[in-house]
Amino acid sequence: MELQTLTPHICYLPHDPQRDRPMLACIQGQRHTLAIDAGYSAAHVQDFYTALTRQGHPLPDLTVLTHWHYDHTFGLHAAQGLSIAHQRTNEFLRQQQRLAQSGPYMEQLKAEDPHFRLEYAGQDTLHIQLAELTFTNMLTLDLGQLTARIFHTVSPHSEDSTCIYIPEEKILFLGDATSEDFFNNGYMDRAKLARLIDTIRATDCALCVLSHCEPLPKADLLAYLESL
């Protein structure tokens, strides 16, 4: 999987449909480099770092989580630097830690999810780590000539959904916020979707980056969401 360039300061490792690995992005400021999400596993993080190094990019010293789901967070223990998440994300991850410590949780996930089974083939231990820094509503980071506005949003996908907006580049990272609730039989809450649409519309972005598909122009994403 090759690293893709969005702007001179933003690149990403694309979504891998074989394992359903989400995309991982890198925002390079003059002082700090921010990663979007911590990946499915340590192997996912290593593939990301290898791709960054191969193209001469610095490795991230900050990592922000878009939500708690395991394909976005179970690689956090292998990530460099300071990790950031919404407070509810850490609460959910703490629940995951308890599940992993109290029984055969990895075997359960392998039985339920073929992508997880492939990602963790030959492994029998989970390393679930909490983020070191949490926020409640919004957190603004000065990366050096680039700003990362990290904010919680209402979303049909997960109650801890977090977006990252880079105003200088007019790019909005949405994680899986536009998707249905995977852990509630794929339920799509129309009221929450409507509020998310309003949030996207109100954000001065040109491009929207979702975790499991290619980046989309804002107008195209809004048209799709409004058709659901």
PLM features: residue spans?
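Short amphipathic alpha-helical segments
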Residues: 47, 75-78, 97, 186, ...
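Active-site metal-binding motif and surrounding structural segment of the metallo-beta-lactamase
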Residues: 43-89, 201-207
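Residues at the C-termini of beta-strands that transition into short coil/loop
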Residues: 7, 14-16, 87, 154, ...
